[in-house]
Amino acid sequence: DRLRSRGLGDVYKRQILPNLLNPFFSMVAHYINRALVNRGYRMLLCDTEYDYTKEREMVQMVAQNKVDGIIALTYNPDLKIPPDVRSVSIDRYLSGSTTCVASDNYNGGRLAAQKLVENGCKNLAFLRIGSPLTSETNKRRDGFVAECEAMQLPCTQKILMDDAPLSEFEHFLEENLKDGRLAFDGIFCVTDKLAVAVIKMLRRMGQRVPEDVQVIGYDGLRAFGDQDYYCSTIIQPVEAMAETCVELVLGETNPNTPSLLCLPVRYAYGGTTKA
């Protein structure tokens, strides 16, 4: 009942990702592929370009070819996976018994607030662009805001949907600039990708990072994959998440696995905070 290549005897798992141009998605694909290869499996990678129709087509192909399992990172809340196909999702909730694997987003948000305050910040901001769908990534904001409230610190928020232009963040920053000073001195961005864009905006406005404004992202992305961090960041344990996904989809774990597995995160200095 397994899909095999022409006479080679390779066993396949399929991974569905929305877009490989996103460096976090590429990192996820890398580690999942490595975990599968180490177990004698091969990965069929589906880059769906955020197209729900393509995702459905990929799942139909899985059902027809009897691929062993699916590891999905999808923005489609209505994606249906056949009940006889083992499946795992990353960060998103799928219907049925599919387990969701994620980093500890809530505590990651709390940690970002703590680090900004430890580095002397007194007025914080949270910036996010993303899907309106319910997902584990939403908890980054929840944890950050909760920690700000616990420390009795002001927290300004700017949240955009996926289709909004990034220039709206620049307008937001400009609106909070008075006499050459920004209204907040610490910013937590929902991803490293957004953090890098915001840092460029700040510097265009004459704001020094980290001297005037400190910025923390989320993901743990490195330049060229293995060099310096793009920014100070909350690191997702992507390799451990990939191993967990593979263990689940291969049935190597306890059959009574909970519907959500959260893996611990950590902070790393990347030059956009004071320490």
Label the predicted regions:
Residues 68, 121-124, 185:
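Short acidic/polar active-site loop segments enriched in Thr and Asp
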Residues 72, 126-127:
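Short beta-strand and adjacent tight-turn residues that come in two discontinuous sequence segments
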Residues 1-12:
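Single conserved hydrophobic/aromatic residue that forms the stacking wall/gate
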Residues 174-275:
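Flexible loop/turn connectors
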Residues 18-27, 46-54, 101-111, 127-174, ...:
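Hinge/beta->alpha junction and helix N-cap segments in small-molecule ligand-binding domains
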